[in-house]
Amino acid sequence: MSDLVICKTSTLQENEIVNDNNGQYKVFGASGIIASIDNYQFDKDAILVLKDGSKAGKIQYASGKFSVVGTSVILIPQNEFDAKYLYFAMLAIDFCQYKVGSGIPHIYFKDYSSEKIYYPNETQRNRIEKVLTTYETKLAVEKRMLSALQKQKAFLLQSMFI
């Protein structure tokens, strides 16, 4: 993997973010997009790997211009490697084996940088990426529907016992 990506870090802390949600650039944290601000740190598609805490090893995909809280490393594909394909390939990596630390778990790029990633020709990559993106989109829709149904259930149960 180390020959496919450049590893960057961020020093941005959550308490430094003034979030009025009117900014045009996303800020990624451990739970996804946490704010919108008026400036950005990165302007290339990247894979974000959470490096600290109970969710260490969680993978996110960031595109466009964005910023990242310092709890993640930013893996930027080099030499025009396909970021979205690398994101999907990295989802198959078991990062638990790289966690260290007893109190707050950490993972380090130096430990998982030797992971091998299958990188087929462009036609195959595009086909794989298209299929997985379709499933990812469908999954997001299903999660939103489930959330809406859970809210409806809670409302109906509350209405029954007033």
Question: Model-found features: residue ranges?
Answer:
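A short, aromatic/hydrophobic, helix- or strand-capping loop or linear motif
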Residues: 15-18, 99-102, 143-147
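A short beta-sheet element
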Residues: 29-91, 100-104, 108-112
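Amphipathic alpha-helical coiled-coil/heptad-repeat segments
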Residues: 118-162
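Generic alpha-helical structural context detector
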Residues: 3-6, 87-91, 158
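Short, recurring structural edge motifs at helix starts
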Residues: 13-14, 103-104, 113-119
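Non-catalytic DNA-recognition/assembly elements of restriction-modification systems
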Residues: 1-12, 17-28
